[in-house]
């Protein structure tokens, strides 16, 4: 998850340079923005962005879209690139143009949208492992991977709603005695508007064997992203990050 944060750091660096007026030479800020794109994508994806060997966030998006039926340009398939990668790719290009144009405020709004979407595969991972732990006899491996996803998203959920974060933590923490996947899913979905994401973007946990959603893991139907709330959540997230992560470590 350190790469995830470094991607954001590079974009923030680009915006800092933009605000300082370094955009006058069109190099520093644009270069930092491009570095953010590189750390998001990696070198293995190639020109078409379709591979099973990727290692960074781009590949995580593609992997989770197959689990949640959000692949393809329309976001309704289990094959190909994640729709989120199409969407974020467009935002990368837009942000680059805005910085080159010196429109720092608009670039900030674009980064807010990118950051919100980057959290989606982490939320998908949290919900899928909650289901596997309760309904598919998941063991230590699933518990550890689920706890890892939770460690990455819990501060952001907490910034939106501490009660929702507590619900997720109680079910997914290392050493949890029981997991309630429906409670986890409901708690996460309740903060979608504050996180700036939608039900359609997240999808539902797909059972490829039956070509249906796992029971209780269907996509939700009502959520409207709010960019203002997303900005507030982003600011608050970093303030609680280390406290909540320490709680996860101490419970091990």
What are these regions (language model features)?
Residues 29, 139, 232, 251-252:
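Exposed boundary/loop context
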Residues 1-224:
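Mature extracytoplasmic or organellar-lumen-exposed domains after removal of signal/transit peptides
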Residues 222-241:
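C-terminal GPI-anchoring signal of eukaryotic secretory precursors
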Residues 239-251:
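A cross-kingdom C-terminal cell-surface attachment/processing module
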């Amino acid at each position: 998850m350190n790469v995830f944060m470094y991607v954001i750091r590079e974009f923030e660096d680009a915006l800092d340079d933009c605000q300082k007026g370094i955009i006058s030479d069109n190099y520093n800020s644009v270069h930092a923005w491009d570095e953010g794109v590189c750390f998001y994508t990696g070198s293995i994806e190639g020109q078409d962005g379709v591979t099973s060997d990727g290692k960074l966030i781009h590949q995580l998006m593609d992997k989770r879209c197959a689990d949640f039926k959000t692949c393809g340009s329309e976001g309704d398939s289990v094959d190909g690139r994640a729709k989120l990668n199409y969407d974020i790719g467009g935002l990368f290009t837009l942000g680059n143009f805005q910085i080159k144009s010196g429109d720092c405020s608009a670039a900030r709004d674009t980064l807010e949208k990118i950051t919100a979407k980057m959290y989606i595969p982490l939320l998908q991972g949290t919900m899928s492992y909650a289901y596997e732990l309760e309904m598919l006899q998941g063991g230590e491996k699933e518990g550890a991977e689920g706890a890892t996803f939770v460690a990455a998203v819990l501060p952001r959920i907490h910034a939106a709603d501490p009660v929702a974060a507590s619900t997720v933590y109680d079910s997914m923490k290392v050493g949890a005695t029981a997991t309630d996947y429906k409670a986890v899913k409901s708690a996460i979905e309740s903060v979608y508007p504050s996180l700036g994401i939608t039900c359609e973007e997240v999808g539902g946990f797909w059972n490829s064997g039956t070509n249906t959603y796992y029971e209780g893991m269907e996509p939700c139907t009502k959520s409207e992203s709010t960019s203002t709330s997303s900005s507030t959540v982003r600011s608050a997230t970093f303030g609680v990050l280390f406290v909540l992560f320490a709680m996860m470590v101490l419970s091990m």
